[in-house]
């Protein structure tokens, strides 16, 4: 099995598979076959090269892969949900979460982090009958939470009737469902009137009293869980992140590594929306607090805006 995306994938190979003869070269053979199968409309030939030397992998990651990722993200950063005529659905994960449907917009990528609006558009163009379908956005029900009649109809159909309605910008009102592939999980932290975010790589405790794995067990499965949602890392700095509840100003805690990864863009968003400089300095992490009492004391000292916002519950 594998989880994650881009340069953060994790692949597990069972001892049984290894004992049966599975080796690194077989990854290449599988990739080769899948690329030819998935992209047969545009790919005639392909070559797979596997690097196992950590130094080579690190060099290639920084010199080739990350610049490509950054270029894609830069293109997306110029787009907004309002600037495009359609959104896209993604049901790639329905094999193990039958009722889950991702609604992918320019400002909210798929919760796995691997499917942006541009990716979903390309997927649909390559395979019009595939996992990514066009969703119109003409009939607005509630602009505040990002609810559309068109989106509800699509989700109802694609979830086989398991879901009736969904919002794009709220964690409390009709939140989008999660499968199990999410990069991050966001959960309400009532003592601080904000939310904590944990990423898949973080194995420690959160101020919510749960680890990532424990949060995942109650958030996934294609069921709406108000107060909790799975999402991609890039959604954290989005102006649409929990827009209905006040936006990124609700973020009170996340692991230090994740905070460093999103700091630049999150600080830019907070500055633009609220006029706050260096917002991430106000956000707690595991080196500061792993319990709500210590976290609230830190937030009070920093003057975190969430403490003065309307109650979420």
What positions do the PLM features span?
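Cysteine-centered metal-binding/redox modules
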Residues: 1-313
């Amino acid at each position: 099995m594998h989880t994650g995306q881009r340069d953060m994938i994790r692949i597990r190979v069972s001892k049984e598979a290894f004992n049966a003869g599975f080796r690194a070269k077989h990854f290449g053979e599988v990739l080769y076959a899948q690329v030819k199968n998935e992209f047969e409309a545009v790919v005639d030939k392909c070559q797979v090269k596997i690097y196992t030397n950590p130094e080579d992998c690190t060099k290639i990651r920084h010199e080739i892969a990350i610049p490509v990722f950054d270029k894609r993200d830069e293109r997306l950063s110029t787009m907004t949900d309002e600037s495009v005529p359609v959104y896209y659905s993604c049901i790639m994960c329905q094999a193990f979460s039958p009722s889950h449907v991702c609604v992918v917009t320019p400002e909210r990528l798929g919760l796995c982090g691997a499917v942006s609006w541009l990716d979903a558009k390309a997927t649909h163009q390559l395979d019009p009958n595939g996992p990514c379908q066009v969703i119109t956005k003409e009939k607005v029900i509630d602009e505040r939470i990002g609810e559309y009649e068109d989106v509800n109809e699509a989700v109802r159909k694609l979830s086989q009737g398991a879901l009736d309605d969904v919002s794009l910008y709220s964690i409390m009102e009709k939140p989008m469902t999660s499968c199990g592939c999410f990069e991050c999980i966001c959960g309400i932290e009532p003592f601080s009137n904000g939310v904590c975010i944990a990423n898949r790589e973080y194995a420690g405790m959160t101020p919510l009293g749960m680890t990532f794995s424990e949060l995942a067990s109650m958030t996934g499965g294609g069921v709406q869980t108000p107060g909790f949602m799975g999402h991609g890392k890039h959604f954290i700095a989005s102006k649409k992140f929990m827009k209905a509840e006040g936006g990124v100003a609700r973020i009170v805690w996340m692991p230090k590594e994740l905070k460093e990864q999103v700091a630049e863009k999150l600080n830019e968003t907070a500055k633009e929306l609220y006029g706050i400089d260096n917002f991430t300095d106000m956000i707690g992490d595991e080196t500061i607090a792993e319990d709500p009492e210590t976290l609230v004391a830190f937030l009070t000292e920093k003057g975190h805006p969430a403490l003065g916002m309307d109650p979420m519950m």
